[in-house]
Amino acid sequence: MAWSSAGFDRWVARSARMGATAGVTMFAAAAMLAGCSKSESPSTTAAPVTKIKVGFSIATLNNAFFVGLKNGVERGAEKQGFDLVQTNANGDAQQQVNDTLNLLSQGVQAIVLNPIDSKAIIPAVEKANSMNVPVFMLDRGSDGGKVTSFVASDNVALGAAGAKWIADQLTKRYGSPKGNVVDLIGLIGTTAATDREKGFSDEIAKYPDIKVVARQEGGFDQEKSLNAMTSILQKYPQIDAVFGANDDNTVGAEKAIDNAGRYKPLGDPGHIMVIGADGTAQALSAIRAGKQDATISQNPIGMSAKAMTFITDYETKKDVPANYAWPTYLIDKSNIDSDGAKQYGLWALEVKQ
């Protein structure tokens, strides 16, 4: 048989076409398999984590206790992973309402309030209620609206403890609970002042020979308490003890006692006993110096950090207490360096103001 180059060329061309078709078919099949494999594999891209946005309105930062509250809220928010937005009302009740409404307009998912005035704050609480934003109260409460959780010391018990301490000290001095006492009330309009006054008044009334010779508002303020105590000292030559609703009240009272030349050291029969509340650095220094006898310490850092855990509990559908009483600790010269004081009372050493 004769060999034909033309026939060979036709065979090569036909083979090339068949090979190309097979290659296209195999590539298409591979692509289909790859597509199936990709669609059936789970996505490895993590969804972005959305932080809970929390608004916090504090009454003031004019004393160490409130600085402690702020520090605790910040620590708690960081630990819980919150996006925290803060405002300071600087002692202005209407400003605090406006601040709270502004926080709500920013889309916060929870609001923490430390009210200046328990009545003035009601519209802000009710607005949060209407928006289904849970309200958490810190140290001071509201007289209206729905509050999810109120975290504070038991201020009625705190006031009663102050009265009981005075009665015990007067018994040691005179053999029975008797003497003249001054009551410097806190900032009128706050639940803390109202409750402490109730606790103190109810307890001190159990001792008929203890006379409350003066009750005046100290306003949780050193200058106001200084002025109030100055007037009281001018009117009453015999005063045995002073109850200050917080340590700013007592610091003001101590200055007035000094200015009047009425200071006598611990153990002297003329010593005017002074007890306050909060456990501020000034109070601790005054206790060491013998100017103040005692303070009922409440730890605002721990208190406010605890409140932040309740926001997490609420958001994760766990039970949240309507009221949570933060523990207090009475500090005097005998226990100021004790382990108990270090654990429960010396929060002020962590605060810079």
PLM feature spans:
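Sec-dependent bacterial lipoprotein signal peptides
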Residues: A2-A34
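A residue-level marker of the well-folded mature domains of exported/periplasmic proteins
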Residues: W3, C36-Q353
